[in-house]
Curated annotation (Swiss-Prot):
It is a single-pass type I membrane protein. Residues 1-14 form the signal peptide. It comes from Yarrowia lipolytica (strain CLIB 122 / E 150) (Yeast). The lineage of its organism: Eukaryota, Fungi, Dikarya, Ascomycota, Saccharomycotina. It is found in: Endoplasmic reticulum membrane. This is Protein BIG1. Keywords: Cell wall biogenesis/degradation, Endoplasmic reticulum, Membrane, Signal, Transmembrane, Transmembrane helix. One of its GO terms (biological process) is cell wall organization. One of its GO terms (cellular component) is endoplasmic reticulum membrane.
Length: 332
């Protein structure tokens, strides 16, 4: 009987929660740093979630409901590869293994939409290819995701968690902006079974330790690099937001030359262009050279004409002078 009582004391309803924001929220961190235990009440969990989401610094707010989630699920970190990557590349993270119950995520999503002037959009979890239609504008949006309850068997449970993490990645990558705030927990009334609490357990402890290293947060400050595109929040403009995602790169087309070497099409065009330019230059030069003798010939003709005119003038002058002298003699 005594052992049974001790077991009940150590076992209670417990709901884990993971929260993150792209931005370093100093006030939020000061608030959560006051927490001295890895267990909090459901009321406090709701307060922390609203404090994170109502900051309104993000373009996208993702509210994830995973019914039946337990703290021990995070012991297998390999089931959450994308979520872990998000936590590594965000400036603010908060995790709590044990909350005394879930929160009303639907109400949270509605309050964020109202507080931040965001639009709620639906996610089609039945479409495994494109659960969320891509959009290119920067209007703030709240994305509410409601996964199916987790199976009870260990292998099936891990498979479901991994599949949901993959679905979360597809949804997040469909958004145009890397400025994201996210919460993942269980909806009130859909919590997991009672679970023995470990006072030393932490969710993703390695990620949390890495963020305490000096300068670690500056590496990803204000951006997540989801598409390997460094984004600076201060310099990002509305036009640049449309180009956050890396444009597809195409391999250069090549042609096989006679010697068996591959030639890039762009290089080939440059070579052809250079040859054409050289040929045009030669044609222009030859045209100028061909025109030059004609100029000399014209110059020589003009000189002959001028010389003949001078002779004719001199001849006439002599005739006039001779006639004048003759008249003078006759008058004497």
């Amino acid at each position: 009987m005594k052992l049974a009582l001790l077991s009940l004391i150590g076992t209670a309803l417990a709901t884990p929660a993971v929260m993150l924001s792209h931005k370093e929220l100093t006030a939020f961190e000061k608030y959560t740093n006051k927490q001295t235990s890895n267990s909090i009440s459901a009321v406090e969990l709701d307060r922390v979630a609203r404090k994170l989401m109502h900051d309104c610094s993000a373009n996208t707010y993702v509210v994830v409901n995973q019914p039946g989630l337990k703290a021990k699920d995070f012991q297998t970190e390999s089931a959450f590869p994308f979520l872990k990557k998000l936590l590594e590349r965000t400036s603010t993270m908060y995790t709590v293994p044990y909350a005394d119950g879930g929160i009303e995520l639907g109400k949270l999503a509605n309050s964020v939409a109202k507080q931040c002037g965001a639009v709620k959009i639906d996610v089609n979890l039945d479409n495994n290819i494109t659960p969320l239609e891509e959009y290119m504008d920067t209007t703030k949006r709240v994305i509410e995701i409601n996964f199916e309850p987790l199976p009870n068997t260990y292998v099936s449970r891990l498979a479901a968690l991994a599949a949901n993490d993959e679905m979360l990645e597809k949804i997040v990558r469909a958004t145009p902006s890397p400025f994201i705030a996210l919460i993942l927990t269980s909806q009130k009334g859909e919590e997991g079974d009672f679970e023995t609490r470990n006072p030393d357990f932490k969710i993703f402890p390695g990620v949390a330790r890495a963020k305490t290293v000096p300068g670690a947060k500056d590496k990803y400050k204000y951006h997540m690099e989801l598409q390997n595109v460094p984004v600076d929040e201060k310099k990002l403009t509305a036009e640049a937001l449309l180009k956050v995602k890396t444009p597809p790169t195409h391999a250069p087309e090549v042609r096989q030359t006679g010697d068996g070497e591959l030639v890039d099409d762009k290089l080939l065009l440059m070579i052809v262009g250079s040859v054409v330019a050289i040929l045009l230059s030669l044609l222009v030069f030859n045209g100028l050279m061909a025109a030059k003798p004609d100029v000399v010939k014209v110059d020589k003709t003009d000189a002959k004409v001028e010389k003949a005119v001078k002779k004719e003038v001199q001849k006439k002058e002599r005739l006039v002078n001779g006639r004048v002298e003759q008249l003078k003699r006759e008058t004497r």
